[in-house]
Amino acid sequence: MKKCINIEKIQKIGLFCRLNTNLNKQIDFLRAIFLQKNIELVLLEQEKINLKDLQELDFLISLGGDGTLLSLCRQAYQAKKPILGINAGNLGFLTALSFNEAESFFKDFFKNDFKIEKAKMLQITLYKKNKIIKKFAFNDAVFSRDNALMANVEVFFENKLFNAYYGDGLIIASSSGSTAYNISAGGPIVHPWSEIFVLTPVCSHSLTQRPIVLPYGFELELKVEHCLLYLDGQEVVDPKEYDKILIGLSKKELSFIHKKNRDYFQVLKEKLNWGK
């Protein structure tokens, strides 16, 4: 895909990580790489990113695991800056490379030898009296029961009842999020370039409920009982506080920096033992 980084003009790179973890050596290592190119490495405050500050940066680095990357995506999507995920955590499925690969990657990077891949986010629109609140999730929006009663999730499309789900809940996953909670609940693996989203029931009290794949442009209304809404597992929304909830794919896209030879199917094999 078309690159949106001018290598010759890079001046500042933002680094997002959990500062309470022992990553000082990794941070110093990255800073040394960029100093050789007269590039400043700017540490970003994890709890709250200032969008104005992001506008001065050429791209962003997430140093940590998938949770760190998700947190950056949800906070920085409005800045429209490319993101590079460097794994310093456990699984690191979403991150582009391990920390041990960083030095060799940046040698190629500064030769313009990399690629940009784009992915759409989920948009959650909440209505409360005269207010409209928009929230975004990169992986998934999950309705999960909040007590001993079964979750009741009714889904409407164009004001018609689409389906009703009874059980532990319902996962609404983006294509990128298909390999997260969705796959654990029996949902399909979806290539991240696909502009679709998936509805996967969790422990459905039915023998006939199956996951379904829906296209970009569909917007669903959800009416729920006995459950909470979790966005990327990092933010909790109580549906009872809102009059109406709509979910679909957003027009907003995130741009990710990857190695030029990255093979998605090889990542599936290495990280999830796919096909083995």
Swiss-Prot record:
Enzyme Commission number(s): 2.7.1.23
UniProt keyword terms in alphabetical order: ATP-binding, Cytoplasm, Kinase, NAD, NADP, Nucleotide-binding, Transferase
Highest taxon of source: Bacteria
GO BP: any one term: NAD metabolic process
Catalytic activity: NAD(+) + ATP = ADP + NADP(+) + H(+)
Keyword hit for Kinase: yes
Residues bound to NAD(+): 66-67, 139-140, 168, 179-184, 234
Disulfide bonds: none
Alphabetical list of SUPFAM superfamilies matching this protein: NAD kinase/diacylglycerol kinase-like
InterPro entries: ATP-NAD_kinase_N (IPR017438), ATP-NAD_kinase_PpnK-typ_C (IPR017437), NAD/diacylglycerol_kinase_sf (IPR016064), NADK (IPR002504)
One GO term describing the cellular component: cytoplasm
Catalytic residue list: 66
Locations listed in the record: Cytoplasm
Gene Ontology MF: a single term: ATP binding
Pfam families: NAD_kinase, NAD_kinase_C
Cofactors (names): a divalent metal cation
Main function: Involved in the regulation of the intracellular balance of NAD and NADP, and is a key enzyme in the biosynthesis of NADP. Catalyzes specifically the phosphorylation on 2'-hydroxyl of the adenosine moiety of NAD to yield NADP.
Similarity comment: family membership: Belongs to the NAD kinase family.
Protein name per UniProt: NAD kinase
Protein's organism: Campylobacter lari (strain RM2100 / D67 / ATCC BAA-1060)
